[in-house]
């Protein structure tokens, strides 16, 4: 359901907490866009933040942990069971952050993202059961901060993946991807989502242009995502439409 993710747009919003913010929060900001250089660093960050959130943690620690669990599930998990645990732990951490700071758009984003990925990994029926929760979080994030670029990737992929009878809409998916790209043209996950949508609507030449732009991008917002997710997916999609017009 997702093609996402993060980059500079994912600034961890400071929220009032009883404890001091862990220095690991700042490190997450760096590693989240360079994890391809040393994926094992995600293990250490996960473990360190798990220790930091014991007791009465700072909301920023919980948000950082939710983010790391999501990336870890995508990149480090070796089995479906490990992925499910990672996304579940991520949404639990984000839920705790929301309890402390209900207007923290970043906390809500990671709650929605982990929830959506958990449902997707669990299977179609579970994913659809969680759909209202994800949709409500998207609406809330857009109300809180319409400049939160990553939420447009999440929203676009939800509109793209969900059946039309349940709210899926390729036109709205395209609109969400374009809105995100207007804010950050180098957010390659958005461009991959746009390319997929254009393929599904039969606009092959336009899709090919967008997907080639992903491969040609020399300064992606998130280099790690571009390296391990967006570029490989763009190549696969381009191969899939080879010879089509």
Placement of each model-derived feature along the sequence:
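"A position-specific structural signal for the A-helix of alpha-solenoid helical repeats
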Residues: 26-31, 64, 71, 110, ...
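Short coil turns that delineate tetratricopeptide repeat
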Residues: 56-57, 102, 146, 185
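TPR alpha-solenoid repeat register
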Residues: 59-61, 107, 151, 190, ...
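Terminal, low-structured helical/coil segments at or just beyond the last alpha-helical repeat
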Residues: 200, 206-245
């Amino acid at each position: 359901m997702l093609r996402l993710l993060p980059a500079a747009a994912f600034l961890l919003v400071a929220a009032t907490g009883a404890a001091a913010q862990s220095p690991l929060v700042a490190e997450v900001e760096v590693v989240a866009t360079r994890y391809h250089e040393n994926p094992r660093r995600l293990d250490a960050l996960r473990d360190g933040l798990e220790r930091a959130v014991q007791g009465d943690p700072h909301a920023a620690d919980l948000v950082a942990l939710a983010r790391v669990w999501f990336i870890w599930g995508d990149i480090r998990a070796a089995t479906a069971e490990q992925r499910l645990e990672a996304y579940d732990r991520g949404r639990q951490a984000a839920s705790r952050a929301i309890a402390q700071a209900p207007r923290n758009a970043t906390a809500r984003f990671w709650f929605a993202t982990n929830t959506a990925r958990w449902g997707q990994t669990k299977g179609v029926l579970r994913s659809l059961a969680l759909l209202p929760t994800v949709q409500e979080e998207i609406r809330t994030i857009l109300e809180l901060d319409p400049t939160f670029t990553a939420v447009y990737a999440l929203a676009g992929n939800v509109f793209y993946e969900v059946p039309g009878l349940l709210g899926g809409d390729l036109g709205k998916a395209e609109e969400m991807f374009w809105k995100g790209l207007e804010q950050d043209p180098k957010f390659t996950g958005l461009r991959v989502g746009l390319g997929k949508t254009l393929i599904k609507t039969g606009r092959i030449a336009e899709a090919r242009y967008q997907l080639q732009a992903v491969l040609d991008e020399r300064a992606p917002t998130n280099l790690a995502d571009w390296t391990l997710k967006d570029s490989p997916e763009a190549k696969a999609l381009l191969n899939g439409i080879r010879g089509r017009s």
